Amino acid sequence: MSKKIINEVIDILEDKKYTYTMIEYPEHNRKSVDIVLNSKEPTLIRVSEDKVTKEEISDLKKIAVSTLTASLVVTNEEEEDIVSVKADNVFAVSPEGFKKVINGEKIFLYRTRGGIFIKIRNYILKHKREEMGYSIGDVAKFLGVSRKAIYDYEKGDSDVSLEVAEKLIDLFGDDIIGDVIWDSIKGKKEVIKEDITEFSPESFKSKLIYKLKENGLNILSLKLTAADLIVKDNENNRYLVTIENKDYNKSMKKFYEAKKLASYTKSELLIIIRTSKMLKECEDLGYKTYEENDIHSLIDEIKGSNGRQS
C-alpha cells in the first residue's frame, strides 16, 4: 500500500467528513481491501502504486457484486477523467478521479481493452426516443450505427464511442450521459454463484467449501482479506466465514478485521476454530464460533436462520 496515495485518499475522505475503516489484515502481505468507506453507497477501496493482481481484483469483485456496491482501486496509473473497468463493480481511478467520485461529480469516460467509451443511461435513451416519436431505425440512421446497436444501447448491454455520444447529446440532451461507477452498479444483477474447481483433500477450506455447496449454499471464496468465504442461503441471508490459522496473534487480528468487513457488508460473522484455547477466547469476546470438526452445526445455523436477517 502506497503511503503517499493512502494519505491522499484519507485527506479526501476527511475533508468531506466521510467515516471509514482501515482493514489491516493481512499485515505484511498483499491484500485486496485497504479501506471500507461507510456512506450511503458504501465502497471498498484498494490503494496501490503497483499493478493490482488478479487475486486482488477477484476478491474486490466478489465482495462488491455480492453486496451490490463498488470497489475502487486508487492508483497513479489512471488518468484524471477516465475510469478503468477491471471487473464487474471494480473500477480503477486516479487520486484526482477518486476525489471527483467522493465529491459526487459524474465520471462518464471509461477504458476497457476495447478502447474508450462513454457511459449512457439506457432507460433515459429509450424514454426520450419514444417520447419524441423516433423509431429505432430513425435513431440508428442518425447515429450511423445498426438497429441492433440501438437495441443494445437501450438494454444497457453496450455503451457508446465519443463520436456517437456527441450525436446522442445533439438529439436527446446531455442528461442521457451516465456515471460509469454508480450507474453500472445499479444496473448489475447480483451474482453469487461460483464454480470451485480447485479441490484439495488436504485443505480444510476446500473441504468446507465442498460441504457447504453440497448443502445447497452459495459460496464465494476470498484469498487476500480477513474473511475466507462469503456464504448465502436461499433466502439471501449473507455470512462471512473466517477460519483460524496457525498463528494465534494473526488469527485474533484476522477475526477483528473480519468483524469490520461483516459490519460493512451487513453480514453475520461466523468463525471456525481449530484449537481449544482459541475457542474459549473467542467465546469470551462474543464471537459466534464453530469447531472445525462440527461443521454440521455451522450448516444448521445458516440453513435454519431464514428470515432472521434483513
UniProtKB/Swiss-Prot annotation:
This protein's record includes keyword Transmembrane: no
Keyword Transcription regulation annotated: yes
PROSITE patterns in alphabetical order: HTH_CROC1
CDD domains per UniProt: HTH_XRE (cd00093)
GO MF term list: DNA binding; DNA-binding transcription factor activity
Matches recorded under SMART domains: HTH_XRE
Entry keyword set: DNA-binding, Transcription, Transcription regulation
DNA-binding region, residues: 136-155
Domain (HTH cro/C1-type) ranges: 125-180
Alphabetized InterPro entries for the sequence: Arc_TR_HTH, Cro/C1-type_HTH, Lambda_DNA-bd_dom_sf
Official protein name in the record: Putative HTH-type transcriptional regulatory protein LS215_1371
